[in-house]
Amino acid sequence: MELSPNNQIEDRKPILTADGLVQTSNSPFEPTISQETQTSNGIGTQCQLTVDQLDIEILPIIYDVVRCVEKDPLENAVKLRESQDCNHKIFELQKRFESAREQIRQLPGIDYNKDEQLQRLELLRNQFKLKQQLIRKYKDTEF
């Protein structure tokens, strides 16, 4: 643990780079402690979600909206009530879309563009290969 220039504690973990060197500073792909501190202090109130934790259930509401639009009542009073119900269901669908957008914004890595994600993936693959090689090397060594 080290102190940053603004006197916040930063946890700098050693990282094995693709060329086999150990890097102690945070990479541009990992959040710094100050970003995590902002989140824990309530400045950024988002928490990290996984794809499995997403609660995006929009198909039943879309089905209800389509059913509502397909109805064609003959009486004006019934038409008005059906129209209000349809507007309510559309508003509910809009709320679900907004909720889905908020949840997707909380996914880790969503703020990286495609090139950054591919670069990060390649780096992780190289780290994985290096770790596999180290494991094989130490398995073969006798103590």
From Swiss-Prot:
One BP term from GO: regulation of transcription by RNA polymerase II
Entry GO CC: mediator complex
Compartments where found: Nucleus
Pfam families: Med9
Entry keyword Transcription: yes
Keywords: Activator, Coiled coil, Nucleus, Transcription, Transcription regulation
Coiled coil regions, renumbered to chain: 84-141
Subunit structure: Component of the Mediator complex.
Family label: Belongs to the Mediator complex subunit 9 family.
Protein's name in the database: Mediator of RNA polymerase II transcription subunit 9
Taxonomic source organism: Drosophila pseudoobscura pseudoobscura (Fruit fly)
